[in-house]
């Protein structure tokens, strides 16, 4: 069937194509529709062996079950003849040429769906999910981009929510993960071999009683208008992107900055940006333009860029109306200003005229070989250069997290978290409308940037999925990438004949892209910062084994629950030698298991000594410590009461505070000594940031987690990345 350039293959044609790549189907025979069809169908059934299935097949027939075009469990010749006759009678003129498919009756209590779909942004994907007639209702699926490796195919099986169905099930053997992986790789090879394929459906894939798998239905759709991938064009685009990386140095480490459109009014962008630039300690040369030559915050302005010295300014921060910005780009080029950040609105976000104006701006920037950021953005921060070129606060402490965002608000949010936690930022930039330079290009720079240890990104719309995926893949090879994505929507109209297409969505496909490329995707800004801060301040775990050390029993329980339910980390049973060593330091009432609950039996040195025993043990890969700050919390209450500093309170307050400070310091020191992550969590990290224990964690350069669950989740995600890149076992 050919509709609007799309060719839908019949089931028989689809199976014939896929068999070439190793897809295993049930034994079957195709019987053409003619005067002898019924007799031929009966003979085919007898040769295959009863019981059999008989289906009506045609190029225009997709959902056979819904139309009643399948007869199951046929166990004798007479029944086969009746079924063949009834099915042929159901054929309509819209079905085109039809035939009968006579196949061995396969059975299995578990059904899967596998296939190929083409996403308009990211290209071809392999799909695996729970199959059968409730496929769309259950919608438990995973996607992975083509090409798919054997390793990737095995990993897909663990991404389904109901993956326990792959194990032993109601007297049946566990599924052959090897056979299932081979099926997925075969689908990938078929799609790679023929770029015109737009979708493949295999539904169901039956899991037999012995765990082997067999495909019993197939549907292939091709798009004759698709000539193949534009590899040459994509290569040229990547080369162009890579050539811009050197220009980012002029943006994030400029020798000089000019604020174009400076203002004397404290409510205007031209004032705020100049104020932030000066106040945050930028040491390069600062210039400003002002039509009336006003002196703004001690900076004597000039009338235009043409009045500035040449080859001394690397970046222009533009706060002028959109109508003036083409001329400003030309003036910047004359003065060899190579990077320009435009805050002005009135472009792509402002209707048809704005879209046209943005296109003119893009064309001019490319013509002049200027790195253009924005328009309609809030600015950038580069703490290694003490640079705060933005129209809003805050300015974060120095650190190793670098932020890129399609939303300026998220840039501010992440920097606010940095100020609150004292886990600092290296670079941060709002992409604005991303006319010429968006998140992919910024990621390419972060990948090569020595100041960046981890990239933290917020994404909404995706302009070029393949470019974004390539940038993600590039950076995760050398450093972690944490992503929050908003704006999950339907992936648009896909072929109604395809179950695979119906199950796809932007969000599921994006999950597949992230998983395949080692990207750490999270749901919220809070979790994103937790994870990025963990990457930036802790060693990567070398394995899954974690121990929870707690002086607060309840928090140990709920943290352990998160670890167990997440099924990423392993809450190990304490080795006998470790348990015995801990018993020598604690009263007999301690928990004697993991979590290690000290049960109130601590002396002055107990926590540091127990923490050390756990951290240095070869069976332990990471440690979470709960209960910091409790002593200092009591100390605070003592200082606020009417009896302080009498009755020995001054001495005990000092002791309590020193103990919490010591615990935090020991955690940091042991982490460095053992090269293992040791995470410290307490609600006081939010409830009382001036608690000496919390402050000591911050002074050590590490994150004080708001609770054990958040620490456990962050640790699990860092372990997954470490495992993906081959660091962890």
Predicted stretch roles:
Residues 1-729:
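Catalytic-core regions of core metabolic enzymes
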